[in-house]
Design a protein with these regions (language model features):
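Alpha-helical transmembrane segments and their juxtamembrane interfaces
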Residues: 14-15, 108, 307, 383
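N-terminal periplasmic/intermembrane-space "pro-region" immediately following the signal or transit peptide
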Residues: 2-69, 410
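Outer-membrane beta-barrel pore domains
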Residues: 24-28, 43-46, 61-68, 76-77, ...
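Residue-level detector of intrinsically disordered/flexible regions characterized by low predicted structural confidence
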Residues: 4-7, 91, 343, 405-407
């Protein structure tokens, strides 16, 4: 009964308010705000969005050799490892001004040491300024991905294999560095690059069809150790042939890399300033999966690498690449993408202990199940052989393992 009385009173109040509004002279009413007033009232922080993704992994199913590991790929591979967050990201992005774009990405699964996990760390922090209204020409300042290699530029949330290739990723560890980059792409090409990601075709994102940049060269979140900047250039041109989209590309970088003291073993022989030539060039070719897809890259160059015969670090030749084949198909309301990747690399890894000299090859066979827009499950079986030398270790292991990843996007 009390509820009925409350409802009746509320209805009566609404009717009275409506009658009062109708009887009020038009002069006393406030005018509705114009679109210009609404626009001017909006604040820059109203244009900032928040998004992210997380990757939960287990790498030890059907493991044949617990001594097989890969520091560059995933430290969760190998003995005494268990469940892990490989990545857990939060992104703040938006346009505080019509020609200014900001992008700040945090990772809250970073390891501070082998015994301390899940620290918050900046991955990206940059600003793009566009010189024209169409935003075809822009300059980027800050810590960002270096435009070298499709595999490096493609977000890990879009990549089919669980880790980037050794050959391309060893050139730009963590894919990122601090610098300034000039990018150009016609408006229609920018729309195509955006669509390749939004339509689930595993695009790399928009780094222009041409990019030119200067960056420190010591990798992300690390201080500059010499007076030489790296220079990088990339030309990549996506185009459509019938129902297929193809993107060929070429890129190169050159600079001087300085080995940090904490990555050198006592007794290893190095140059007086520990600074070495570091340069590479790479070719890329991508056929986006509609339904069959191919992604292939190969790079070559020279960089610091350990020489076991002289117990020294010197500049040595390097080469290697990968090829990934995939097939995208619908399964009810979900999408299945089976894939296979073969990769090979022979050369140094400048960012590892004593600039280890590697000789590796690996085949990965897997399937990505896109359960929904926000949930994906990937199973991947790896057949791997890894050999490297540093001052303390002559490592040579091979083995197989089944890996599982659950990815959520938010």
């Amino acid at each position: 009964m009390k509820l009925h009385r409350f409802a009746a009173a509320a209805i009566a109040l609404c009717i009275s308010a409506g009658a009062y509004a109708q009887s009020t002279p038009p002069d006393s009413l406030k005018k509705a705000p114009t679109p210009q007033q609404i626009h001017s009232a909006s604040k820059w922080y109203d244009k900032i969005s928040l998004k992210g993704y997380a990757q939960f992994r287990y790498n030890r199913l059907l493991e044949s050799n617990p001594d097989l590991r890969c520091d560059q790929c995933d430290k969760g591979i190998g003995g005494k490892q268990g469940f892990e967050f490989r990545r857990a990201r939060l992104v703040l992005s938006g346009n505080p001004h019509d020609r200014l774009f900001m992008y700040i990405q945090f990772d809250y699964s970073s390891d501070a040491s082998s015994t301390s996990k899940h620290f918050l760390q900046i991955r990206d922090a940059y600003f793009d300024y566009s010189f024209d209204k169409k935003k075809e020409i822009r300059v980027r300042f800050g810590q960002s991905k270096v435009p070298y290699g499709f595999d490096n530029l493609q977000s890990s949330s879009n990549r089919l294999p669980l880790d980037r290739s050794d050959a391309l990723n060893s050139g730009t560890p963590n894919e990122r560095d601090f610098g300034a980059f000039l990018m150009y792409a016609p408006e229609k090409k920018r729309e195509l690059l955006k669509r390749l990601v939004e339509d689930g075709l595993k695009g790399s994102g928009d780094y222009g069809v041409f990019a030119l940049g200067l960056y420190n060269g010591q990798s992300a979140n690390k201080p500059e150790l010499n007076d030489n900047l790296h220079v990088v250039a990339r030309l990549s041109y996506p185009f459509q042939i019938g129902n297929q989209i193809v993107e060929p590309g070429i890129q190169a970088y050159s600079g001087q890399f300085t080995l940090a003291k904490d990555q050198l073993s006592t007794g290893v022989k190095i140059k007086e300033n520990a600074t070495y030539t570091d340069r590479r060039a790479a070719f890329s070719l991508v056929l986006f999966p509609q339904p069959f897809g191919i992604q292939a890259e190969y790079n070559f160059g020279e960089s610091p690498a350990f020489d076991a015969e002289t117990d020294s670090i010197r500049v040595q030749k390097l080469h290697g690449g990968y090829i990934t084949a995939s097939f995208r198909t619908k399964a009810g309301n979900t999408t299945l993408v089976p894939f296979v990747r073969y990769q090979v690399y022979d050369g140094g890894k400048k960012h590892e202990a004593d600039a280890r000299l590697y000789d590796m090859n690996e085949t990965e066979i897997g399937v990505e199940w896109q359960i929904s827009k926000n949930l994906e499950l990937t199973l991947a079986y790896a057949i791997s052989r890894r050999k490297y030398d540093d001052f303390k270790t002559a490592y040579n292991e091979k083995g197989n393992l089944l890996r599982l990843q659950l990815q959520t996007s938010y």
